[in-house]
Amino acid sequence: VVPDVVISRQIAATGVPNKPYVTVDSIPELKDYAKKFNHKIIGIDPEAGIMRKTRDAIQVYGLHNLRLVSGSEVSMLAEFSHAVRKHRWIVVTGWVPHWKFTRWPLKFLEDPKNIYGGEQHISTIARKGLQQDMPEVYQFLDVFKWSPEEMSQLLIWIHADQDMYPYENALRFIRQNKSLIESWLP
């Protein structure tokens, strides 16, 4: 049974991010610079939602001179990191929140036909009756809000530790964001 009480929302986004040194500003422009991108868009798992949207974008925007390359998130990030170090042009699939937006300055390419759906949300949901059964928990969840940058900061710390110490990194986040955390408490 899916809980039916939405109690908070966080901003999220998916699309095609790029480094600011890449002078392309919109997805349709990619076809004009396909050679600079080695005729590739680097993606993740072929069945991921963002990959389906990227295949749609290739069709809708006529990006037939670009090939969507699937792989793991790790392989996509490795290729992206290597290209950034070499100051090469690269285009990848991306989403917020993700630690790469904290690690590197990135911009989403404009999506004039809204293939990726524009701004999205991450929702916190609770089971029916939680407000009556556990009012403090409900109140905490109701006011719990953090920015994509705050989420990404925690994610980059966890990633830097190769996911070995998420609890310690959560404590680090709490220590460095005391006023934010206190604003969530009943």
Where do the protein language model's features map onto the residues?
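A bilobed periplasmic-binding-protein/Venus flytrap-type ligand-binding module shared by bacterial periplasmic
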Residues: 9-20, 120-133
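Short amphipathic alpha-helical coupling segments at ligand-binding clamshell hinges
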Residues: 26, 132-144
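Domain-level detector of nuclease and nuclease-like folds
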Residues: 76-77, 125-127, 135, 140
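Solvent-exposed, polar/charged alpha-helical surfaces in well-ordered, non-transmembrane soluble domains
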Residues: 28, 32, 52-56, 78, ...
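Ligand-binding pocket segment of bilobal, Venus flytrap-like solute-binding proteins
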Residues: 44-112
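Extracellular/periplasmic catalytic domains that process cell-envelope and extracellular macromolecules
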Residues: 4-7, 34-36, 85-86, 117, ...
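C-terminal functional modules
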Residues: 144-186
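A conserved helix-loop-strand patch within extracytoplasmic ligand-binding domains
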Residues: 1-43
